[in-house]
Each structure stands twice: as structure tokens, then as C-alpha cells.
Design a protein with these regions (language model features):
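Hydrophobic transmembrane alpha-helices of multi-pass, membrane-embedded glycosylation machinery
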Residues: 93-101, 189, 207-210, 247-252, ...
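Membrane-interfacial loop-to-helix junctions in multi-pass transporters
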Residues: 64-70, 138-144, 170-187, 215-223, ...
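Transmembrane helix-loop junctions in multi-pass membrane proteins
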Residues: 3, 7-18, 157-166, 196, ...
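Core transmembrane alpha-helical segments of multi-pass membrane transporters/permeases
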Residues: 120-165, 179, 183-192, 196, ...
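Transmembrane helix interruption/hinge and helix-loop junction motifs
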Residues: 15-17, 81-88, 197, 218-219, ...
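Hydrophobic alpha-helical transmembrane segments of multi-pass integral membrane proteins
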Residues: 177-210, 228-243
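Long, contiguous bundles of hydrophobic transmembrane helices that form the permeation core
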Residues: 22-140, 243-342, 370, 374
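Re-entrant/interfacial helical elements at transmembrane boundaries that shape
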Residues: 1-13, 25, 200-213, 228-229, ...
Length: 375
């Protein structure tokens, strides 16, 4: 989820890469929970059965064979814990990947035949996995470099002209000082920008022009930046561009537009999660208060409460959008569940009591309807 943007977030906030990873833990789990519930409900609605595939190696068998590939990923975090910069951490992780590739003949980046003198040095080097890896990495970095360079120009113009502050003033004026409206306007801006540019560029641009509006309303800086980054990521699955669903359709051979619509159906509950970050005074608990240092003094009770409310809100929205709880839900029950999901996001006591009451009513209607159907 984070990708290269994690390093940029760390640079903006002047925090460590590990703090960025920490902030992403609960939001990522909530997003996966959304997808799991959506798919599980589809399975129950349409009566899907298990599919038996051909004989393939189990995940455990493959892990036992190729466990060493995980070392390069783990080593990035290990080197950063030792105080290395992100650049050096990635460099030494690459060295670890090269070294561990020699543990098996079929994964080595430099063919054994070269060392055994059974292959010409030059030809063997040209056909080696190392050269192909370097070639692929060099090609892939061009896209990131060009994106960051282009975004850097935009950020420079916005900063030097004061457009960022002016833009924030415009947003605050239109929102009338309302945090809810400011968050909605900011989400729309990030979403629109994200339709045209990649995630990293979208985050960089909006962190300069949109984040100050949220910060001006006393939203913690790290929460404002994660709000923007979250919507920059979600723009990847949003029509009309929807780059990720189009890529998935190309891999599976499915229809791009049908894949996009299905993906769009799965994501609405996830769009509500970032609003917990900025609307609720305890919402930063979903980001584990933004750093390991702050987490050490955190109120775990408030973190547990806000996480529980977020989970219930997601479950209400998922069941409402899918139209299924214990059985097929009618329009009235679906409306109650969706309304409950939205009400739970708003941090007022009355709204959350109302949200839980609507969920209780919906559950009662579903249970009674199921009993009548079985009678």
C-alpha cells in the first residue's frame, strides 16, 4: 500500500520510515477487513462452492524452499532500526538479496556455471538474472524519478507563489470553518488529482495544497497527511481512470469496465475510514498516535474503542451496500445499515448512539425475518 510514498511521508513529517509503517497498520487491516467481508457476503449470497485446482505445491512447501527471499525485505527494516538511512538500507537489502540468491541453484542471480567454468564469462553475465534485475530496476525507477521531478516543480511553484496557503484559505472559507466540510472538500480534491497522476505525485501535490487546511483546524499533522495519502491510494481504484482494476482485468482476461465497477462496489466502506483520523479527537488512535514514541504513552483504551467503532461502522456499511446480513436485506434495512455506518463516523455521542440503535434494529429485523422463513 505504501510503496515509495512512505519515504516521502517520512520526509514531509520529519519522522522515521518505521513510524510511517506503524501509522499504516490499523488502516491497512481495516481495508483488508472490508474486502474480506465483501467477498464473504458474495460467497453466501450466490451460494459459491469451493473450487478444486490441479495439484500444486502448498504455500508451506514453497516457503520451506524459498524462505530466504524474505530476508531482503526484513533486512530493510533491520538496517533502519540500526540507524541506516533509507537509501543505504535499500542498498544493503539489495546486497542481501544477491547473496541469498546463491542458496539455491534455480534462484541464483549469477549462474553457477560461470563459477564452475562451464559457461563463457561474458555470455553468462549477459544472460544472468542479476543483469535482468538491474535492467528492470533501472527502467522502473525512471517512472518514479520523472513523477517526483514533475511533482517537485508543481510543489515549488505552489510554495514560492503562496498558492498553497491561498488554496487552504479558499477551502476554509467555503467550508465555513466546518471540519467535516473541510475534510469532504479535501477528499474530493485529492481524489480528483489522483485520477490524473500516480499515487506518489498525488500525495506530494495535495500535501502542499490541501493538508494546511486540515492542520489549520487543529487536525494533527500526521493525521492530515495520512488522510491525504489514503485518498491518493483510493483514487487508483476509482472510475473513470481506475488504473488498478484495469491492470487486474488485463491479468485475468476480464472486462475492464465490469472489473472496475465490481472493484468500486467493494471500496465505498474504505472511503469512510480516513474520516475517523480527522473528525474524531481520538481518531489518531487508528494511526497508533503517529510514532513509536507517542505510542509508548498512548491510552490503549481509547485506541481500542475507536478501533471497535471503526470496525462496526465498516461492517454496517458492508452489509448495507451488499444487502445481506443473516439473509437478503430489503431497501429499508439497507438504508438503516448505511445510515448507521455514516453516523458512527461522526464523533458526537448522539450520532454514535443512533448508529448502534439502527444496527440493533436492522439485526432484529433480519433475525425475525430469518426465523419466519425457516418456520
Amino acid at each position: 500500500m505504501l510503496g515509495a510514498a512512505a519515504f516521502i511521508i517520512a520526509e514531509f513529517l520529519k519522522i522515521s520510515y518505521l513510524d510511517v509503517l506503524l501509522m499504516a497498520v490499523i488502516p491497512t487491516l481495516l481495508y483488508y477487513l472490508t474486502l474480506f467481508l465483501m467477498v464473504e457476503i458474495d460467497v453466501r449470497k450466490f451460494g459459491m462452492k469451493d473450487v478444486v485446482f490441479g495439484q500444486i505445491e502448498s504455500a508451506w512447501s514453497l516457503t520451506k524452499k524459498y524462505w530466504f527471499h524474505f530476508l531482503s525485505l526484513v533486512s530493510i527494516i533491520a538496517f533502519m532500526l540500526l540507524g541506516f538511512s533509507p537509501e543505504l538500507s535499500v542498498f544493503w537489502a539489495t546486497v542481501v538479496a544477491l547473496a541469498t540468491s546463491f542458496l539455491r541453484r534455480d534462484t541464483t542471480l549469477i549462474p553457477y556455471e560461470i563459477f564452475e567454468r562451464r559457461a563463457p564469462l561474458v555470455r553468462g553475465a549477459l544472460d544472468s538474472g542479476l543483469l535482468k534485475a538491474l535492467q528492470g530496476g533501472s527502467t522502473a525507477v525512471l517512472n518514479v524519478a520523472a513523477t517526483c521531478a514533475g511533482a517537485g516543480i508543481i510543489v515549488g511553484v505552489v510554495t514560492l507563489t503562496g498558492l498553497g496557503l491561498k488554496f487552504s484559505s479558499i477551502v476554509l472559507a467555503y467550508a465555513g470553518g466546518s471540519l467535516l466540510l473541510t475534510a469532504i472538500y479535501t477528499a474530493l480534491i485529492v481524489w480528483i488529482v489522483g485520477l490524473a497522476v500516480p499515487v506518489t505525485a498525488s500525495y506530494i501535490i495535495c500535501a502542499v495544497i490541501a493538508a494546511p487546511a486540515l492542520i489549520a483546524l487543529k487536525v494533527p499533522e500526521f493525521a492530515a497527511h495520512m488522510f491525504i495519502f489514503y485518498y491518493a491510494v483510493l483514487s487508483e481504484v476509482s472510475p473513470p481512470t481506475a488504473l488498478s482494476p484495469f491492470a487486474a482485468a488485463a491479468i485475468t482476461g476480464g472486462d475492464p469496465y465490469k472489473t472496475t465497477l465490481q472493484c468500486w462496489k467493494y471500496t465505498p466502506p474504505a472511503f469512510l475510514v480516513p474520516f475517523f483520523f480527522v473528525l474524531d479527537p481520538h481518531g489518531s488512535g487508528l494511526l497508533l498516535t503517529g510514532s513509536f514514541k507517542a505510542l509508548a504513552d498512548a491510552d490503549w483504551g481509547s485506541i481500542a474503542v475507536i478501533t471497535f467503532i471503526a470496525v462496526v461502522s465498516i461492517m454496517a456499511l458492508v452489509t448495507g451496500f451488499q444487502g445481506w446480513m443473516y439473509r437478503n436485506a430489503g431497501p429499508a434495512v439497507r438504508l438503516l445499515l448505511i445510515s448507521a455506518g455514516f453516523l458512527l463516523v461522526y464523533p458526537e455521542r448522539w450520532s454514535r448512539i443512533a448508529g448502534f440503535c439502527l444496527i440493533a434494529v436492522s439485526m432484529a429485523v433480519q433475525i425475525l425475518g430469518r426465523r419466519r422463513a425457516l418456520a
